[in-house]
UniProtKB/Swiss-Prot annotation:
The gene is rps8. NCBIfam families: PRK04034.1 (NF003115). The keyword RNA-binding applies. This is Small ribosomal subunit protein uS8. It comes from Methanocorpusculum labreanum (strain ATCC 43576 / DSM 4855 / Z). PROSITE patterns: RIBOSOMAL_S8. GO terms for biological process: translation. Gene3D superfamilies: 3.30.1370.30, 3.30.1490.10. Keywords: Ribonucleoprotein, Ribosomal protein, RNA-binding, rRNA-binding. HAMAP family: Ribosomal_uS8_A. The keyword Ribonucleoprotein applies. Belongs to the universal ribosomal protein uS8 family.
């Protein structure tokens, strides 16, 4: 059976593993987009590391959790946002100003809403972590 939204399934697996106190989780399939999202999460300390494992079927990510994730999820549909509108989405998905990140894909790559604001670029919303 195919997965309808592999990124949503992976974010849910990360949240569930964190809620149960696990220090590692394996998610599949491994995609380049989700790998870029994991890099952003690692930059902000939400995960300690990850490794892509090629199993010949679609790959897997072995993710080491830091225990700092309260909630994470995807934003569907992937809304296009301008840099001026990022604050309204921040209010909608994050519990407080400066607490957590919204991950978005831009013409300059996958980054947090803070980095996008500094660079002055908009993009499509992918998910949130806090």
């Amino acid at each position: 059976m195919t997965k309808q939204n592999p990124i949503a399934d992976a974010m849910s697996a990360i949240k569930n593993a964190g809620d149960t106190g696990k220090l590692a989780v394996t998610v599949e399939p491994a995609s380049r987009l989700f790998g870029d999202m994991l890099k952003v999460m690692q930059e902000y300390g939400y995960i300690t590391g990850f490794e892509k494992i090629d199993d010949g079927r679609g790959g897997q990510f072995q993710i080491a959790l830091s225990g700092g994730i309260n909630k994470c999820g995807v934003i569907t549909p992937r809304f296009s946002v301008k840099v001026e509108d990022l604050e309204s989405w921040e209010i909608r998905y994050l519990p407080g100003k400066g607490f957590g990140i919204i991950i978005l894909t831009t013409s300059k790559g996958v980054m947090s809403h803070e980095q996008a604001r500094k660079l002055g670029v908009g993009g499509e919303l992918l998910g949130y972590v806090f």
